[in-house]
Amino acid sequence: MDMQERYNRRENIRNFSIIAHIDHGKSTLADRILENTKSVETREMQDQLLDSMDLERERGITIKLNAVRLKYEANDGQTYTFHLIDTPGHVDFSYEVSRSLAACEGAILVVDAAQGIEAQTLANVYLALDNDLELLPVVNKIDLPAAEPERVKQELEDVIGLNQDDVVLASAKSNIGIEDILEKIVEVVPPPEGDPSEPLKALIFDSEYDPYRGVISSIRVMEGVVKAGDKIKMMATGKEFEVSEVGINTPKQLPIEELTVGDVGYIIASIKNVDDSRVGDTITHANRPAEAPLKGYKKMNPMVYCGLFPIENKDYNDLREALEKLQLNDASLEFEPESSQALGFGFRTGFLGMLHMEIIQERIEREFGIELIATAPSVIYQCIMKDGSEVTVDNPAQMPERDKIDSIYEPYVKATMMVPNDYVGAVMELCQRKRGQFINMDYLDDIRVNIVYEIPLSEVVFDFFDQLKSNTKGYASFDYEFIENKESNLVKMDILLNGDKVDALSFIVHKDFAYERGKALVEKLKTLIPRQQFEVPVQAAIGQKIVARTNIKSMGKNVLSKCYGGDISRKRKLLEKQKAGKAKMKAVGSVEIPQDAFLAVLKMDDE
């Protein structure tokens, strides 16, 4: 197509994503939009069409972002090209949201007519506003018996500052209001800016690995044009490739002639190495490069680290490959090799949060068939040593000796919780117990309160969310963001089995809670570790000092069962022999530790 056609086409493109709190009906709305624009034939339609991963369907959540092109004939007689980018709603996947927003000009904000605005809704709205997106508010599920659309409209105006008249009332499940939403998209979302005659600039916002075609990158073209046969260059790495195919997702991949300004599609350029197509990088032409790369979105740093070890040592290299492939379209996953005396060779892996960690572990076990043992997660600590140097610790087993450390800093997060009035006391008590500092509290209306605390991340990552939910009967919503590292009085707790340190069970704890945590853990391990032929002491120690101890009793074997009556010295001889055997076994014997024991470190607060 010539330049003029490209300019004309640009005016009719609308790029938008759908943002919402988890479970407010985002993926269902995406399904209806696909259906009403006749992008998918009825026989291929299935619920949560864009959630292509099995895990996403099982858990009913969106994990990966997805982009798809639709055609829409509007009431003004023109045909518009929509690019819909579906995003996850869970706090751990907010980087997926920020990625897809970087490729859009507008966002549909979906709010549940019964639940109203939740913590995650606000977090996503702020992300959208940071990216200068136009917001189109939709109140969804208006056909629910508990729906209060008018109250929610008022909330949108009071809390976010959106005009009530712009709100569309809809029910994605019953197909109500979908036409209004499509018309509103044409009206509210601005067409993309950018010049097709300028040098190429395209943002990579996702990529996946195909064993036959190499890396497939999802891109949004900001300036210029790209087509098959072009020589392209990655601006971050400087590597050059030849494009073999460009195309669009309709949700299936469909090759087309070219991608121009405003287009969202995919590009294949026989890129074999996963590292060469990094999410957030800018693609340009090798012979006519752009002057500066696009500003990618901010790199998300992992918040939580844990060790992943294959149960079979021979799977070590397969695990490395699995992590590399997952890292390709999950920019926030980090890993490096580590070895543990208890578990052998594995990887220290960084995640954004606990759900992210669970999903990655499950994907490795499912998609790559590798059985894993995971150690208890920990956060990153900064240690200032007495000689003035700084040490970063993401693995409790590597914490330097306490007498060499001057001070320890741990990450704090700002936790925002939306809670019904009746549960404010319970939530504040939970935050105090987790060493939180109260910041402020706003009453949104008669029923809900927004509470803000500063809490150490180490207290949040384990089971804070579960406890928050159980303390509020499931009504609270929660969002957190990192603020800074603060000095804390922390100590490293070692666990000794049979007198040997088990490095994978070490954890870092605040000194005030050390005794009770240590006591709770040894008691818990006593129930989890199977009994041996000999008695096994389980001890919790800080440095050289033992703070708690218990014994796992030995299994008794009656060696006297064959002695009928007879001489006492005969019995004594057998008992002495057994005793000597047990002593020898105890000196040499190792204790098998089941996977549950490694996770026991997490679950100590439940008792």
Curated annotation (Swiss-Prot):
It is a peripheral membrane protein. CDD domains: EF4_II (cd03699), EF4_III (cd16260), LepA (cd01890), lepA_C (cd03709). InterPro entries: EF-4 (IPR006297), EFG_II (IPR041095), EFG_III/V (IPR035647), EFG_V-like (IPR000640), EFTu-like_2 (IPR004161), G_TR_CS (IPR031157), LepA_C_sf (IPR038363), LepA_CTD (IPR013842). GTP binds at D23, H24, G25, K26, S27, T28, N140, K141, I142, D143. Its EC number is 3.6.5.n1. GO terms for biological process: positive regulation of translation. It is found in: Cell membrane. SUPFAM superfamilies: EF-G C-terminal domain-like, P-loop containing nucleoside triphosphate hydrolases. Keywords: Cell membrane, GTP-binding, Hydrolase, Membrane, Nucleotide-binding, Protein biosynthesis. SMART domains: EFG_C. One of its GO terms (cellular component) is plasma membrane. This is Elongation factor 4. GO terms for molecular function: GTP binding; GTPase activity; ribosome binding; translation elongation factor activity. The keyword Mitochondrion does not apply. The keyword Cell membrane applies. It catalyses: GTP + H2O = GDP + phosphate + H(+). Pfam families: EFG_C, EFG_III, GTP_EFTU, GTP_EFTU_D2, LepA_C. Required for accurate and efficient protein synthesis under certain stress conditions. May act as a fidelity factor of the translation reaction, by catalyzing a one-codon backward translocation of tRNAs on improperly translocated ribosomes. Back-translocation proceeds from a post-translocation (POST) complex to a pre-translocation (PRE) complex, thus giving elongation factor G a second chance to translocate the tRNAs correctly. Binds to ribosomes in a GTP-dependent manner. Residues 11-193 form the tr-type G domain. Belongs to the TRAFAC class translation factor GTPase superfamily. Classic translation factor GTPase family. LepA subfamily. PANTHER family: TRANSLATION FACTOR GUF1 HOMOLOG, CHLOROPLASTIC, TRANSLATION FACTOR GUF1-RELATED. It is an enzyme of class 3 (hydrolase).
